[in-house]
Amino acid sequence: MSNLSPLLVRQLGIQDYQTVWQQMQTFTDSRDVDTQDEIWLVQHPAVFTQGQAGKAEHLLQQTTIPVVQSDRGGQITYHGLGQQVMYVLVDIKRQKALGNEFNVRQLVSALEQAVVNTLADYGIHAYPKADAPGVYIDEKKICSLGLRIRKGCSFHGLALNINMDLSPFHFINPCGYAGLEMCQLADFIDPQQASCEKVAPKLVAHFAQLLGYNATNF
């Protein structure tokens, strides 16, 4: 995929989910054939998000944590501080026009493999599942994934648990799976080394390498 354009990476810090969601929609609706593909790195304050396939019964208990009905794929998940969210705003249609063999499934696979490779940097064996998108360690889920495609362009992305309070996951069936256990990087390495600031550059670099982007701006 040597024809891919440079990838612009934006660090958004900590931002409200709905604010960034609206910005993603605006960006996608307004982009043209010359708009650079982008990655947005962000952490969200505590929020449950329901995907398009989400069912109300997967929220097991009402809490003070807000619930947002999102337009991404998938079911319910939780976002909180200490979780690295990476949104991918990629013009899939343009890459096909450039002659690159590029589709939604390949984008999903690249996201999952980027997480697998990032965790391998820490000596951790992780893997995707063909029947349940995301990344797992010993049957526990460490990364959730959901995309939306509009006008041939992707938005939304992945959420990788780094060093966070996992207890809100007990109030839901994560990604629609009853009893699914969640885990995080801090469970496997020195928690002092498990930070979004340390992990994000590795995650971006692996994603860019997998898809052949020729530059990143971090």
From Swiss-Prot:
Substrate binds at R72, G73, G74, Q75, I76, T77, Y78, H79, S144, L145, G146, G157, L158, A159. Keywords: Acyltransferase, Cytoplasm, Transferase. The keyword Transferase applies. Its EC number is 2.3.1.181. GO terms for molecular function: lipoyl(octanoyl) transferase activity. Pathway: Protein modification; protein lipoylation via endogenous pathway; protein N(6)-(lipoyl)lysine from octanoyl-[acyl-carrier-protein]: step 1/2. The keyword Transferase applies. In the reaction, the free carboxyl group of octanoic acid is attached via an amide linkage to the epsilon-amino group of a specific lysine residue of lipoyl domains of lipoate-dependent enzymes. The record marks K141 as: Lowers pKa of active site Cys. It comes from Pasteurella multocida (strain Pm70). GO terms for biological process: protein modification process. It catalyses: octanoyl-[ACP] + L-lysyl-[protein] = N(6)-octanoyl-L-lysyl-[protein] + holo-[ACP] + H(+). GO terms for cellular component: cytoplasm. Belongs to the LipB family. Pfam families: LplA-B_cat. This is Octanoyltransferase. Residues 33-215 form the BPL/LPL catalytic domain. It is found in: Cytoplasm. Catalyzes the transfer of endogenously produced octanoic acid from octanoyl-acyl-carrier-protein onto the lipoyl domains of lipoate-dependent enzymes. Lipoyl-ACP can also act as a substrate although octanoyl-ACP is likely to be the physiological substrate. PROSITE patterns: BPL_LPL_CATALYTIC, LIPB. The active site is at C175 (acyl-thioester intermediate).
